[in-house]
Amino acid sequence: MTLVLSFALVGCNVFPFLQNNPAQQATQSSITTGEIEAIHEPKFGGSYLDITIEEFNNLGFEYGDSVDVTFSNGYKLSDIPYYNGYYTKTNEPLVVAYPGYPYIDVCINNGEPLWETAGLKAGDTATVTLHEKQKYATVQKALDATYTNNRSDYASDEVFANFRPMKGGNLAEGVVYRSASPIDNQNNRAPYAADLAQRCGVQFILDLADTNEEIQGYYQNADYDITWHQSLYDVGNVAALNLNANYRGGQYAYRLVAGLREIILHKGPYLIHCTEGKDRTGFVCALLEALCGASYDEMRDDYMITYDNYYGINEKDDKARYDAVVDVKFDDIARCIAGVPTYGSLDGADYAAGARKYLTDVGMTEWEINKLVERLTNK
């Protein structure tokens, strides 16, 4: 299976038998949730639907189906995919049953908050109806990936915690690390990430995921030793940015710049993390690598270590899925950094210049950027 094939098939009549069988069509049309409550998901701005993943699937929906979502205020999303992960490209809508989520989520992947875009308010409802059976099955199968939260399933603490030093371009060795969260233990990785960071001498943490209130909540409910993390937090060496997933949005960039200014003011080594150390961390680390002169290959290789750590997806053992992730996930990050349109070519892209422009566009000065680069490169 090639990358082009996997995505080209989505728009073709891959399953003609579904359209030619009246009995099957009748069965499909009966698959619906009926009206269910829409719930604001404030972190990323999507809309939870008041139905669990298990309940939703028991109605007859399957990953890879095409569905229609109609909200009670009249806003409608037609012919969108239902996946168990964020497998659409940036700014494309989907219904997602992300492992560990309490409910089904309707959102715009890495885009503007659907709740606001759709004009939703408390008390609104949504109805999900099957549009076409398994229309998006090719993408679902290519990108389907889940992970466990059991340390014994992974080769090392570093793999389990998705912990590693950042590399590429002129980045200095041992100055910046990245990982899963060392404080939010919902995925059982926090103790391992914290221990590894402490052993590497981390002095400042850029927390992309949390608010200060959420960090305080983790302290109050911690089931492991949080002394090291709290010692940094208490002296102002943890910056909580509470980023959403829309790295093309102004709010994301403004908050990120505020955090990068904190790096300028504090000595390293530094740790950058979100919850999994995958999406928000993936973008921010690629941006900083680009700023320090990293090539496309260096940024991609670092980004894709995460998919090997969590899912065993790597170029050697699973090239088709590796290429699919690069196409859907990393290449959009590369385009954003380079200032290339969403579906534009990356040929000849200047990532260092693009990274600078990304930051100056939201008010970071050239002097500040140069100081940041000095911190990251020890030059």
Give the label of every model feature segment.
Residues L271, T275:
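Active-site cradle of extracellular carbohydrate-active enzymes
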Residues L3-L9:
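Hydrophobic core
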